[in-house]
Structure formats: C-alpha cells, structure tokens
Regions:
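Sec/Tat signal peptide C-region and signal peptidase I cleavage site
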Residues: 15-19
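N-terminal targeting signals for Sec/Tat export/insertion, comprising classic cleavable signal peptides
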Residues: 30-51
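Outer-membrane beta-barrel porins/channels
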Residues: 20-37, 111-453
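Sec-dependent N-terminal signal peptides
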Residues: 4-13
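Short structured motifs
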Residues: 61-62, 433
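Outer-membrane beta-barrel translocator/receptor signature
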Residues: 40, 52-61, 67-139, 182-185
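Short, glycine-/Ser/Thr-/acidic-enriched flexible segments
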Residues: 50, 81, 330-332
Length: 453
C-alpha cells in the first residue's frame, strides 16, 4: 500500500500529519547519485580516469579501461569519512559532525596476450566490488517558524462543538532529527580487448544493491496563551532495499602515443525495490492527564525505479612515464528518471520531469611520478539535478593523493578528498514555512593496498 506517497495521513478527527521521510521523488534522486569512492589512485585524481584505465575503479566509468592492463592486479581499499552538516532553521544554526569508517572496494584484473589473431593484441577480464553511496548521516534541526504543525487538542471535536476554541497556536520550539544509514554497492564484471594497438574496447555488466534506512523524529512544543502546553512527538521510519542491473560499453582511442580519447556509455540502472514504512505519534497536554497515542501497522510496498543513463567523454595526455593530465565530462539525463508502475506514480513522475534537469559533471586530474613516489591531485564540479537549485547546490570537490611503489609487485596508495554543497530538507509541509537549509562538507581519507603480478 503506497500510503506514504500521499504525504497526508489522517490520524484522527481534524488532526493531519505530513510525511517527514523522503518522498519517492527524492528517493529516486538519492538512489541515482554516487559518492566519490573507489581506489585511492582514482580518488586522488578526482575520478578523471575515463581515458586512462589501469585502475579498478576506472573500469566502472569506462569498461575499456580493463584492456589497458598488461598483467594481473589485485586491489583493496578502506575509507574514512568525516561528515559535517550545518543546519539552519529560521536563524538557528547547529553543527552536526560525525565520522564513519568502512571497507569500500576490492577487485582484480587478469590480462592475456593475443590468441593468434594479429589484430587482437590482448584480452582482459576484471571484477570489482565497490560502495557507490554511503547513506550514513545524522543531523538535528532546531528553530521556530512561528507556525505550528500541531494546533489542536486531539481529544476535542472542533467540527461538532463550536465552543471548542482552544488552539495551541503559539510555537515555543520545533526540533527535527534525521538519521539515515545503509549503502548502495555494486559488483562489476568487465571484459575488454586491444584492437590494432590503437583501440581499447570494453563492456561491463553491473549488479547493484540498495539498503537504505531512515528514521525521523519531530518534536514540537506549543502553548495556548493561557499557560497550557501541547507537547507533540512524531517518529517515522522508512526502510528501502532491493537490487538492480545495468550495462556499460566504452572505448579508449590512441590518436598518438601520448594522447588518449575515451568515450563510454552507462545504461540506466533498473531497480526492483521494496519498502517498509512505520509511524508513531504521541501528544501530551499539560492541563489533562491524557496522552494521545497513535501507532500504525507497517506499510509494505514494492515498486521499480529507472535511474538516468550516463554518457562520459574523456581526454588525457600522457608525458611518457613522468606523468599525465586528464579531463572527464559526464552527462546525466535526470529528467528521464522514472518510478514504476507508471499508473501508481503519475504525480511523482510528473514532479521528476518538471523539477529536475539534466546535469553535467566536470573532472580534472593529474599524476606525476618521482621514482617510487607518485603525487596526484584533482578537482570536480557536479551540477545539482534540481532545476531551481542555485550554484551553491552544485558539488565542488578537490583531492590530493600519494602513491608508494615498494616493488614491481606491491604498492600503497593514499588519497584525501573534500567536497561541499548546499542542500535543503522540508520536514514541515506548511504554506509559508521554509525548508531547513543544510551546508554539507564531506572529507574522506582512503588507502588502497595493491598487488601486481
């Protein structure tokens, strides 16, 4: 039963409550977005790898990258994230800081020489597991909009008795707590070949998994102007989980020995998702001994999601064994995001089409080798998919990296990445009440253990 999608739940009498968990449209955007996660080499160059290859995470951007390998490689990565979310609601600002640690990537590649065909110089296969989105976040919003969500005594019948004129319309405090957890991860299988020494060709199949949990708490204290108080507490929980599939194709072309051009396409991800929605409400009045409580049976609902496809164009120049510079451009058609079955999501799909825009992401990275030490750096800019979002809602990020090659077979890579963007969360759907503003800064440190053989 798709109760949550209506955003309005009639609890009792005249009491109306709005959904505070993410809407289906907002979930669709969230599940279509990715973090900067992967190997430390990839992150150290801000992901500008579409024309380079020779990195396990780059295979997920351009499958032809697997064919660049000349041998076999195994890599595993762990990531630490420091999250700072600064919330502002009607002039009241709260700094919310948390840190998280997780295993983020593991994979391997094997390459073989040609099988007697003079045009096919080698064949490569690869496997990579990676976390694409970390949903762990926690923040508090507190302030006073001056407009109450809970105005009336739930035990009084305002429609049938006109003498019931007690309204708790003086807001003293409004607090919203949002807790999310879970991950979006994927398994990518890729294969590629080098054709006539100038054309790397590749294809991939990727299996995705989503496990998302959200718990929201809303607390409001109001008074009636005569010394009596209403204290309301509302808790909503949402669990969404499921699996998806997509495919990718790509090529890397070498017009000269130093110049590389990459083009790749990632199909939409087709998800089958299931959700569970719970809700609890209690209201305490200071002038009575009664407590109003509503607790609902869980709602379960299954649906499908189609995320945007991705088109990536890349250009890189390699200065022999000394270093390189690389540029990536990615285009995503967010307006084609769809929820299904279409008959059940007419309003949401119209909202996605009208409120979203197709986006561009720009990445630039560089790498320089000094004997066994490699230094890296990068910058990226990712547009917000929301049409009405200002420039501050775009994501800006930079990265630095260090690689140490202890031997031909063993190395360690490290990377630091920081990104910032603005966001908002509308936990009160009341005309004239603003959404909470959020300033989000994520700082990540990643290390990768590398074996070549």
């Amino acid at each position: 039963m798709k109760t949550k999608i209506t955003l309005v739940l009639l609890l009792a009498g005249n009491l109306t409550l709005f959904s505070q968990v993410l809407s289906y449209a907002d979930q669709a955007v969230l599940f279509s977005s990715e973090d900067m996660l992967g190997t430390a080499r990839y992150m150290g160059m801000s992901g500008a790898f579409g024309a380079l290859g020779n990195d396990l995470t780059s295979i997920e951007i351009n499958p032809a990258a697997v064919a660049v390998y000349n041998g076999s490689e195994f890599a595993s990565s762990i990531a630490y994230r420091d999250s700072n979310i600064k919330s502002n609601f009607y002039g009241n600002t709260i700094d919310n800081q948390d840190d998280y640690f997780r295993f983020s990537q593991i994979g391997g590649v094997s390459a073989w020489d040609n099988f007697g065909n003079p045009d096919i110089f080698k064949f490569s296969v690869g496997f990579n597991y990676s976390v694409t989105k970390d949903y762990n976040n926690n923040y508090i919003v507190q302030g006073n909009s001056g407009v109450p969500e809970f105005l009336e005594d739930p035990f009084l019948n305002y429609d049938d008795d006109p003498d019931n004129d007690v309204f708790y319309n003086n807001v003293e405090d409004q607090t919203f707590i949002n807790y999310t957890s879970g991950i979006n991860d994927r398994f990518t299988f890729s294969f590629g070949t080098l054709y006539k020494e100038r054309f790397y060709l590749g294809a991939s199949m990727t299996f995705h998994h989503i496990n998302f949990y959200q718990s929201t708490e809303y607390k409001e204290i109001n008074n009636d102007g005569s010394g009596d108080f209403l204290d309301a507490y509302n808790n909503q929980t949402l669990s969404t989980y499921g699996n998806g599939f997509n495919f990718g194709i790509g090529t890397i072309i070498l017009p000269t020995d130093n110049l590389r051009v990459g083009v790749s396409f990632q199909s939409p991800i087709w998800y089958n998702l299931s959700e569970r929605f719970n809700e609890y409400l209690d209201i305490v009045l200071s002038n009575t001994n009664e407590v109003y409580v509503e607790s609902y049976d869980p709602n379960f609902y299954d649906y499908q999601l189609r995320t945007p496809s991705k088109l990536n164009g890349s250009l890189a120049y390699v200065f022999g064994s000394a270093g390189l510079i690389s540029f990536d451009y990615m285009y995503q058609n967010f307006r084609n995001t769809k929820l299904q079955p279409s008959s059940a999501f007419t309003v949401e799909n119209q909202d996605l089409s009208s409120s979203l825009r197709n986006t561009s992401t720009f990445k630039v990275g560089t790498e320089w080798v000094f004997n066994i030490i490699t230094l890296r750096g990068g910058y990226r800019l990712a547009q917000s998919p929301y049409k009405e979002a200002g420039d501050s809602f775009d994501l800006n990020g930079y990265s630095v990296g260090l690689g140490i090659r202890f031997s031909r077979n063993f190395g360690l890579d490290f990377a630091y990445d920081q990104s910032t963007f603005d966001d908002q969360y509308r936990f009160l759907d009341i005309p004239g009440v603003d959404a909470a503003r959020l300033q989000v800064t994520n700082s990540r440190f990643v290390s990768t253990l590398l074996f070549s053989f």
